[in-house]
């Protein structure tokens, strides 16, 4: 059991969730328990999340796509996450309106004993899920490429939904970290301007880059971090367990008390479950929307980046600096830089682009495009600054 692959564990959890979703929703309508119905919708959230996760994972691995999809399917998960969040909020509105109606005219739960047993079975299924994923809620050493930069957890969409975090766990299993090595020759004026660059910390290790200033950092580094992929699934399962505890509490309260208002406990638990769902759905929609709107991550201040680049030797001004997230794990930057260089433009410009990349890499940005504008053509710099 402990050696099960992560994707196998997710499929097992998906099968359990589907089974108990039908058990809870059928029983909930049969005995008129809104708490069971609400908890079944909470479980439906997990089902949709895991289905989107598996679908997006396969899309992310797919190399067959039309040429017009220049970034492939890397944003499929974000789109799925936003759809899932909107769907959850709509479900919460439905449950909330039903709960209000039951406060006005509280129906009697016909079989609290059955409600108790269904809630207990649901709790047992969640203990199985916690058993499958509990070892992924802790820190452990992990090798990754620098392109999979870990920016602060509060900015990471996977901290609120497993549908986007499972992708990283599966791709990390299949990625093979590798280092490209190359003889470090001195650059001359006859050398290609962007034929080499330094590594992340500015050392002299050479590395190939493409011809428009985009760098791919492949050297693996060892870090100690939580596996947020499976940790997110673990938190979701834990949330389901809390929902089942609420259902069990409502069943026991209705069965073993004789208060005239005891049936109000059922819609109270339903509203509590609604807030639990909204607690994950609203941050999910916000995070997904910010990525789709190409907003700069909260962890990066554009003024700080611009000031650091401006202080580099040879930089006259910086404009058109854009930083955004392609997905929850990949940052992209483009920048126009007005530069003043001595006569040996080839070597000086190569060093300057390396310095600019090192600045951006310090913020976790490894996909960089730099457009130079030379100060000996002031019209270009003036036009760029005013655009």
UniProtKB/Swiss-Prot annotation:
Residues 195-221 are annotated as: Disordered. It is a multi-pass membrane protein. The keyword Transmembrane applies. GO terms for biological process: detoxification of zinc ion; intracellular zinc ion homeostasis; zinc ion import into endoplasmic reticulum; zinc ion transmembrane transport. GO terms for molecular function: zinc ion sequestering activity; zinc ion transmembrane transporter activity. Keywords: Endoplasmic reticulum, Ion transport, Membrane, Nucleus, Transmembrane, Transmembrane helix, Transport, Zinc, Zinc transport. The chain crosses the membrane at residues 10-30, 34-54, 77-97, 113-133, 234-254, 263-283. The keyword Ribonucleoprotein does not apply. It holds the Pfam family Cation_efflux. It is found in: Endoplasmic reticulum membrane; Nucleus membrane. One of its GO terms (cellular component) is nuclear membrane. It comes from the Eukaryota. Residues 195-214 have a biased composition (Polar residues). PANTHER family: FI23527P1, ZINC TRANSPORTER 63C, ISOFORM F. Belongs to the cation diffusion facilitator (CDF) transporter (TC 2.A.4) family. SLC30A subfamily. Involved in zinc homeostasis, where it plays a role in its accumulation in the endoplasmic reticulum/nucleus. Also has a role in the sequestration of cadmium into the endoplasmic reticulum. This is Zinc homeostasis factor 1. It comes from Schizosaccharomyces pombe (strain 972 / ATCC 24843) (Fission yeast). The lineage of its organism: Eukaryota, Fungi, Dikarya, Ascomycota, Taphrinomycotina. The gene is zhf1.
């Amino acid at each position: 059991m402990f050696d099960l692959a992560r994707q196998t564990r997710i499929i097992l959890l998906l099968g359990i969730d589907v089974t108990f979703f039908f058990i809870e929703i059928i029983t909930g309508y049969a005995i008129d328990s809104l708490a069971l119905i609400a908890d079944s919708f909470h479980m439906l959230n997990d089902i949709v999340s895991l289905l989107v996760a598996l679908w997006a994972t396969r899309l992310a691995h797919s190399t067959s796509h039309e040429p017009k999809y220049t970034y492939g399917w890397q944003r499929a998960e974000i789109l799925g996450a936003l759809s899932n969040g909107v769907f959850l909020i709509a479900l919460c509105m439905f449950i909330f309106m039903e709960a209000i109606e039951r406060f006005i005219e509280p129906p009697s739960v016909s079989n609290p004993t059955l409600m108790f047993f269904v809630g207990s079975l649901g709790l047992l299924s969640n203990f199985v899920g916690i058993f499958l994923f509990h070892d992924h809620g802790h820190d452990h050493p992990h090798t990754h490429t620098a392109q999979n930069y870990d920016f602060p957890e509060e900015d990471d969409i996977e901290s609120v939904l497993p549908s986007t975090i499972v992708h990283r766990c599966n791709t990390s299993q299949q990625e093979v970290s590798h280092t490209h090595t190359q003889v470090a020759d001195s650059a001359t004026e006859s050398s290609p301007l962007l034929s080499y660059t330094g590594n992340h910390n500015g050392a002299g290790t050479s590395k190939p880059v493409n011809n428009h200033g985009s760098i791919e950092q492949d050297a693996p580094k060892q870090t100690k971090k939580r596996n947020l992929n499976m940790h997110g699934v673990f938190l979701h399962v834990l949330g389901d367990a809390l929902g089942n505890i609420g259902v069990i509490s409502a069943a026991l309260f209705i069965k073993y008390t004789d208060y005239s208002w005891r049936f109000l406990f059922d819609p109270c638990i339903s509203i509590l479950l609604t807030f639990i769902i909204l607690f994950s759905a609203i941050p999910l929609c916000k995070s997904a929307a910010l990525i789709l709107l190409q907003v700069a991550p909260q962890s990066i201040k554009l003024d700080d980046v611009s000031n650091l680049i401006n202080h580099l030797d040879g930089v006259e001004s910086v404009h058109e600096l854009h930083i955004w997230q392609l997905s929850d794990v990949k940052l992209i930057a483009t920048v126009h830089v007005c530069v003043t260089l001595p006569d040996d433009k080839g070597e000086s410009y190569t060093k300057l682009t390396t310095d600019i990349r090192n600045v951006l890499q310090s913020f976790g940005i490894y996909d960089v495009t730099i457009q130079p504008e030379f100060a000996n053509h002031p019209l270009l710099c003036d036009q760029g600054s005013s655009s």
